[in-house]
Amino acid sequence: MTTVRRLRPGDAPSYRALMLDAYARHPDAFTSSPTERSALPLSWWQARLAVEPLAKEIVFGAYTGEGVLCGATGLSFETREKARHKAQLFGMVVLASHRAHGVGAALVQAALAEARSRPDLRLVQLTVTQGNVSAQRLYERFGFVPFGIEPMAVAVGEGYVAKVHMWCDLRAT
């Protein structure tokens, strides 16, 4: 059984390890690289998980019955006056050994529940690597629809990958 909860500063070591592994294994899925993120001190990761009333980011973690962090995703909230109605889903990762078991769905569901609990939010946006059909289908199940493709969005090695931009209207049922 998987449990999803908001991560806190004390979860920073396991969250950092999960994300660094994801950056290394799936360089096309993330804009950050393992080199740049591994150089950040643990305090940076703890700050990302800070629990504050007006936090600019919230990160959710999925835990196995044994207490192992097997997935994570985050919501980033716009602070600029004209864009406060938007949030960004970011950093979605599920360990390969836990995929196709509902972990990703539970994480997206938790993030959208948090977004819907905020009366000023109207939409959530995300990007997914073009060609990652399983991830795109997961997001579509929760009401996300594509609205554009960003060519050459992320440099990977000598090449580039495109990102599909998607959005979810929180006003829809």
Map each language-model feature to its residues:
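Acetyl-CoA-dependent GNAT
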Residues: 9-10, 16-17, 22-91, 95-97, ...
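Short coil/turn segments at alpha/beta junctions that flank glycine-rich nucleotide-binding fingerprints
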Residues: 101, 117-122
